[in-house]
């Protein structure tokens, strides 16, 4: 089963209960979690309550200014999460995030794999974002041909393949499944295309880094013409004005 913060276009909803399995065969549940607090009476991050066996860490930056004082405050909560991963579990982390590396260095019980890293899981662009060569420790694992674009989606693919491998799915089968993945609504979703060459995308990016990454992906796909970005700062962090400078820089 799964519970995520968006609606996959391959499925009808953002959540599904696990199907019944044979006796002694474990069922799996995938949950998208973040560091926001649990409730007004429990200021621990929500993900502390999930007790994962396989943990994917995509990124760690300052966010949720209404809850956290600074980046170190968030690192503390991520450290609590990392410490509850069992010894037989696995942490799959983004090698490009220094903050994640620093948090992992605080101590962990479990095995660690990195993606977006030549020493771990990596990709090479073959013919644009739609064709990626997937490698693990410099050994080719297969070619991913899909409809998604952008470095963030490619990194997510690496993390998904690594997580699938940890629960017993071969990289070959994971890559084949990803080739059928159509993306998530409001995540770089192309909602209109006009005869004059104008394409219209809808994206949920609400953090300056996410906005910058989204625009970078579009720039590599839409090679001609202007890019016009319309931003609605709706998150609490953005409404508090905590990232005015970062927001301006993300649009350059």
Language-model features, listed with the residues they occupy:
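Short beta-strand-centered segment that lines the nucleotide-binding/catalytic pocket of NTP-utilizing
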Residues: 1-9
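Cofactor-binding loop segments of dinucleotide-utilizing enzymes, especially the Rossmann-like FAD-
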Residues: 5, 94, 117, 232-234
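Acidic, Mg2+-coordinating active-site environments of NTP-dependent enzymes
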Residues: 10-12, 16-26, 30, 37, ...
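Short, well-ordered secondary-structure micro-motifs
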Residues: 13-15, 103, 212, 239-242
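Switch II of P-loop NTPase G domains
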Residues: 37-51, 208-220
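Glycine/threonine-rich flexible loop motifs
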Residues: 40-43, 66-72, 238-241
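Active-site beta-alpha connecting loops in nucleotide-dependent enzymes
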Residues: 184, 209, 216-252
């Amino acid at each position: 089963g799964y519970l995520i913060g968006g609606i996959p276009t391959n499925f009808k909803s953002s959540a599904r209960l696990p199907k019944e399995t044979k006796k002694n065969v474990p069922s799996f549940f995938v949950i998208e979690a973040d560091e926001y607090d649990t409730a007004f009476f429990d200021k621990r991050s929500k993900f502390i309550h999930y007790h994962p066996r396989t943990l994917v860490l995509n990124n760690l930056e300052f966010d949720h200014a209404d809850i956290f004082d600074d980046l170190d405050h968030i690192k503390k909560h991520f450290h609590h999460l990392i410490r509850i991963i069992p010894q037989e579990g696995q942490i799959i982390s983004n090698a490009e995030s220094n903050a994640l590396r620093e948090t992992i260095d605080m101590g962990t019980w479990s095995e660690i794999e990195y993606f977006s890293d030549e020493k771990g899981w990596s990709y090479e662009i073959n013919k644009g974002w739609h064709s990626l060569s997937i490698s693990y420790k410099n050994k080719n694992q297969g070619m991913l041909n899909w409809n998604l674009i952008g470095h963030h989606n490619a990194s997510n693919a690496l993390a998904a393949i690594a997580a699938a491998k940890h629960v017993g799915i071969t990289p070959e089968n994971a890559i084949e499944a990803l080739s059928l993945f159509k993306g998530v609504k409001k995540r770089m979703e192309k909602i209109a295309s006009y005869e004059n060459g104008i394409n219209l995308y809808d994206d949920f990016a609400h953090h300056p880094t996410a906005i910058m990454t989204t625009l970078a992906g579009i720039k590599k796909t839409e090679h001609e013409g202007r890019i016009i970005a319309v931003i609605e700062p709706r998150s609490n962090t953005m409404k508090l004005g905590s990232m005015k400078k970062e927001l301006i820089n993300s649009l350059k």
